[in-house]
C-alpha cells in the first residue's frame, strides 16, 4: 500500500512539473491593415514621327514628368466608339506644359487622399487630321453631336489643351464611374448626377469616384464640361483658346 502511494505521489509531482514547464500562449495584437501605395515605372521609348512633331511644337510627354500617371490612349487602339485605330504612331500623352503642370498637381493631390490610386489618361493632344477622320465617320449619324466639327472650329484636344482621364487602382483597373469612357448618354453627364443617382442610373460608389476625380482635377485649376465626366480643359475662355497653337497636321 505504501509502495502504491509512493508511486501515485511521484506521478503527481511529475505531472505538475510538466504543466509548469509548458510554454505560455502569448496573444499578439492584430496587425493594422496596410494602405496600398501604388507606384508605376514607365518605360521610355523613342518618339515616333508624330510624337516628334508634337514635341517640336513645345508639347510635353506627361509620362516623362511623372511615370506614376498611367497612359492608355484609346484611339491608338481599335477599341473605341468608332471601332477603328486612329492614332497609328501616337501612344504618348502629349499636352501643353501648362496643362501638364496642372495634371501633375492633380496626381499629387490624389496620392495624398488615396495613395492606392493613380490618374489614367485616355486622350490628350489630337492632330487636326485625326479630328477630320473622326468627323467624317460620324457625319450623318446619331453620334454627330458628340464629335467636334473641324470645319466650324476646333476642340481643346486639337490644341493640346484638354485631357480625358479617369482613376485607376494598383491592379491597372479603372474605377467604376457610372458609364464607360466615350459613352454618349445622360449617364456620362456631370450636371445631373444627383438625379442619376436617385433614378438608379449610377451608384453611390460611382458618384463618389467621379467626385474624387473632379476634386483633384478642378482643384488643380482645370475645367469640366457637362456632357463628359472624363474631360477636363485647360481653360474655358474663348479668348485664351484663340492664343493657342493648333496641332494642324
Whereabouts are the PLM-identified features?
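Bacterial N-terminal signal peptides that target proteins for export
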Residues: 1-9
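C-terminal motif of bacterial Sec signal peptides marking the signal peptidase cleavage site
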Residues: 16-18
Amino acid at each position: 500500500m505504501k509502495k502504491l502511494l509512493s508511486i501515485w505521489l511521484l506521478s503527481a509531482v511529475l505531472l505538475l512539473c510538466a504543466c509548469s514547464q509548458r510554454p505560455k500562449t502569448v496573444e499578439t495584437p492584430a496587425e493594422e491593415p496596410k494602405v496600398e501605395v501604388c507606384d508605376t515605372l514607365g518605360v521610355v521609348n523613342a518618339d515616333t514621327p508624330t510624337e516628334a512633331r508634337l514635341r517640336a511644337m513645345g508639347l510635353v510627354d506627361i509620362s516623362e514628368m511623372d511615370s506614376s500617371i498611367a497612359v492608355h490612349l484609346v484611339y491608338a487602339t481599335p477599341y473605341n466608339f468608332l471601332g477603328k485605330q486612329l492614332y497609328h504612331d501616337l501612344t504618348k500623352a502629349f499636352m501643353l506644359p501648362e496643362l501638364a503642370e496642372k495634371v501633375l498637381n492633380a496626381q499629387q493631390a490624389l496620392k495624398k487622399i488615396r495613395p492606392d490610386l493613380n490618374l489614367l489618361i485616355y486622350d490628350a493632344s489630337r492632330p487636326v487630321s485625326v479630328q477630320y477622320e473622326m468627323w467624317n465617320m460620324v457625319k450623318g449619324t446619331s453620334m454627330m453631336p458628340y464629335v467636334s466639327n473641324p470645319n466650324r472650329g476646333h476642340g481643346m484636344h486639337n490644341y493640346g489643351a484638354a485631357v480625358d482621364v479617369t482613376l485607376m487602382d494598383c491592379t491597372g483597373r479603372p474605377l467604376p464611374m457610372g458609364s464607360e469612357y466615350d459613352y454618349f448618354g445622360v449617364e456620362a453627364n456631370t450636371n445631373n448626377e444627383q438625379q442619376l443617382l436617385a433614378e438608379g442610373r449610377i451608384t453611390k460608389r460611382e458618384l463618389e469616384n467621379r467626385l474624387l476625380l473632379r476634386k483633384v482635377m478642378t482643384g488643380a485649376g482645370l475645367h469640366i464640361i457637362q456632357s463628359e465626366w472624363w474631360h477636363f480643359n485647360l481653360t474655358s475662355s474663348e479668348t485664351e483658346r484663340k492664343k493657342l497653337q493648333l496641332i494642324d497636321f
